[in-house]
Each structure stands twice: as structure tokens, then as C-alpha cells.
Amino acid sequence: EVIEEDGTKRFVYLLDETLELDHVGLISTNMAELLVKGITELSYRECATKVSEMTGQTISAMGVWNVIQALGEKVYNEEATLTEEYKKGHVKGEKEVPVLFEEADGVYIKLQGKDRKKEKQDKAEIKIGIAYDGWRKTGPERYALENKVVVAGFSKAKEFQEYREAVIAQEFNLDEVSQRILNAEGASWIKKVKDKSTCFQLDPFHRNKAVKEKIHERTAREAVLELLREEEIEEVFRY
């Protein structure tokens, strides 16, 4: 039993306190981590069964859902705090670079159980953002991004862009960035960036997809794609 400064009492497990273990309700951090890893690949019911077998601690599908919701709420509050600190000008990274490369995309994933009912749909878009200041070759046809920052979330466009900016600002001093290049597929939410000087660039996959959708004549389509592959941009316009 522990008595807090305000006089309230709480009970703790001394070993967990010594090891600085946190809890989500009655669930230990270790078990919560197993649930998070499991739920990315399994249904709530399958995750509950798998984790119960692995740990010897019984948890129901509803129990898994409750833990994920609690963790989600905690993450949401942390993200909101970071965003507010950024808006106040309190977030400024140490890395100073002249050019910042960015990517953004949306991926639809299927929802489960209560999540499906809550959203009144069977899938939702998770927005993804990446920022980095360069790349290096790691092998034949393989490259690794330098100082990569990754952001993901289900929030609306405005909220996501504000949080994305805050996360990037933790790593980079955005006041010192002269040019920001955003490589994306052209969705409307992607264009709602905070820095209006951002240069938008359609990535090769979505560029080629747009050509195939807009140019129906096969010969003309293949000719344009070939010119693009050869980076003959002026020839594309003349064609």
C-alpha cells in the first residue's frame, strides 16, 4: 500500500515498481505488448486465444479490445500534447538540412467488431507520412533512408497534418529547411500541408497509373510511358 502526497492510497506490486513496469488496467506492459503485436495480424478472438496460450493468463476478445482502446487513448493524448507544444513553438529538432524529402500515402484496412459498428463501415484509411534527409546505398539496387521519421494515424486531414508536422519538427529544425519535396499519390488530404511552399511530386507508380487511366490508346500510352522512363519530359509535352 502506498500513500500519495494528496493522501490517497493505492496498491502496487513491489517488483513491478522496482522494474518500472507500467500497467494498462490489470494488464502488465509485457502482456499489453503481446496483444498489440498480435492484433496487427489476428482478429480480437484469435489474438485472445493466442496470448492466453502463450502466457497462461486468460483474456477474452472483449478484454483485448478494451486494452487496445486504453492504449489508443493514451497514444492519442500524447500526440495531442506534442501537437500543442509544436503550435506554441516549443518543438524544434537539432538536425539542420537544406532539403527535406517527404512521402505520404493512405492505406485502407479492414475494421473488426465494435470498431466496424462505431465507424459504420467495414474499413478505414490509415494515413502515413515519412520524412528523411537523404539516402545511402546498402547493396545492389537497395537503398536506406537517412534519419527517417515515420508518422501514421486515422485522424482527419487537418489533425494528421498538424501531428505529422510536430513529429518531423522533433527531428529537424524546420526553420532551416529551404526546400521540402513531398512525393505522393495526389489525394486531396495530402495536399493540405502546413508548409505552403512544399513542392509536390507524383511518385512513379501513381504517375504511371494516371497515364494508363487517362490515355486509352495503347500505342500513345506506351510511348508516353517510355518517354517518362527516359526522363524526356520536354518530349512528353511535345508528344
PLM regions and their residue ranges:
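Catalytic center-proximal scaffold of phosphoryl-transfer enzymes
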Residues: I3-Y239
